[in-house]
C-alpha cells in the first residue's frame, strides 16, 4: 500500500508552527501629551508612580512633554501598554487633570 499523504510535510508544518509561536510580541510606545493645565509636579508624580522613574529622569521627561508637546514614557507589550495608559488616564481624571496618555505601535 503506497503513501497517500506524500504532499503533507509534517516536519515543515511543525517547524512553521514553532517559528510562529516564537515571534516576539508587538511593542507599543506609551506617550504623555502636553496640555496647558496639568501641573508639572503632577506629571513628575505620574512618571514616578506608573513608570518607576527617579525624580531626575521624571523631570527630564516632564520637560520633554512640556517643550516638545509629547514624550515617550516607555515601550511595552500591548497588554502592559494598554494597562499603563488606562491607569494614567484614570489617575489624571481622579485628580481633575486633563493629562492625556496614549499609545502607538513602536
UniProtKB/Swiss-Prot annotation:
An annotated GO BP: protein catabolic process
Domain of life where this protein originates: Bacteria
Coiled coil spans: none
Family matches, as InterPro entries: ClpS, ClpS_core, Ribosomal_bL12_C/ClpS-like
Family: Belongs to the ClpS family.
Cited function: Involved in the modulation of the specificity of the ClpAP-mediated ATP-dependent protein degradation.
Subunit structure: Binds to the N-terminal domain of the chaperone ClpA.
NCBIfam families: PRK00033.1-3, PRK00033.1-5
PANTHER family reported in the protein's UniProt record: ATP-DEPENDENT CLP PROTEASE ADAPTER PROTEIN CLPS, ATP-DEPENDENT CLP PROTEASE ADAPTER PROTEIN CLPS1, CHLOROPLASTIC
Name listed for the protein in its UniProt record: ATP-dependent Clp protease adapter protein ClpS
Organism: Citrobacter koseri (strain ATCC BAA-895 / CDC 4225-83 / SGSC4696)
